[in-house]
């Protein structure tokens, strides 16, 4: 009986570490959250990049929290969505604000971005930061 219990514990423990193609390790269970751990942002934002927790937005302009100033800034619009993420074993799940769900195998993740058409890169000449208002886009 003890051998069976130890075997089950071993199986559960081994399923708690999964690797992503970003060479980041995420493991264990993550209860539903709007704010995933900082060390997991690279993982979560690689596969659904429109989640609000992936962006620092100020005055209508958003910069990536993962890639920072080395990435293109975007205009804050319908592309940036409130998302909750969770992980149970090897199942990673995104819950997007319109009650849209995306689930994937954590160790075999697939990018998902149905909002890509709404993404608008920020260009200084087109949208000066000081004049940009949310109702302009």
From Swiss-Prot:
UniProt similarity note: Belongs to the asfivirus MGF 110 family.
What job does the chain carry out? Plays a role in virus cell tropism, and may be required for efficient virus replication in macrophages.
Q: Any signal peptide, and if so, which residues? A: 1-20
List the top taxonomic levels of the source: Viruses, Varidnaviria, Bamfordvirae, Nucleocytoviricota, Pokkesviricetes
Swiss-Prot/TrEMBL keywords = Glycoprotein, Signal
**Keyword rRNA-binding set for record:** no
Instruction: Report the source organism.
Output: African swine fever virus (isolate Warthog/Namibia/Wart80/1980)
Q: Which named protein is this? A: Protein MGF 110-7L
Q: Which residues are glycosylated?
A: 69-70, 105
């Amino acid at each position: 009986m003890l051998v069976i219990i130890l075997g089950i514990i071993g199986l559960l423990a081994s399923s708690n570490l999964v690797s992503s193609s970003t060479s980041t390790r995420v493991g264990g269970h993550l209860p539903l959250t709007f704010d995933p751990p900082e060390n997991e942002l690279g993982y979560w934002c690689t596969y659904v990049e429109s989640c609000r927790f992936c962006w620092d937005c100020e005055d209508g302009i958003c910069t990536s929290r993962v890639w920072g100033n080395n990435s293109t800034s975007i205009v804050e619009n319908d592309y940036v969505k409130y998302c909750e993420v969770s992980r149970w074993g090897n199942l990673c799940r995104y819950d997007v604000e319109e009650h849209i769900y995306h689930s994937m195998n954590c160790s075999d993740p697939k990018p998902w971005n149905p909002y890509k058409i709404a993404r608008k890169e920020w260009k200084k000449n087109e949208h000066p930061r000081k004049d940009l208002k949310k109702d302009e886009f």
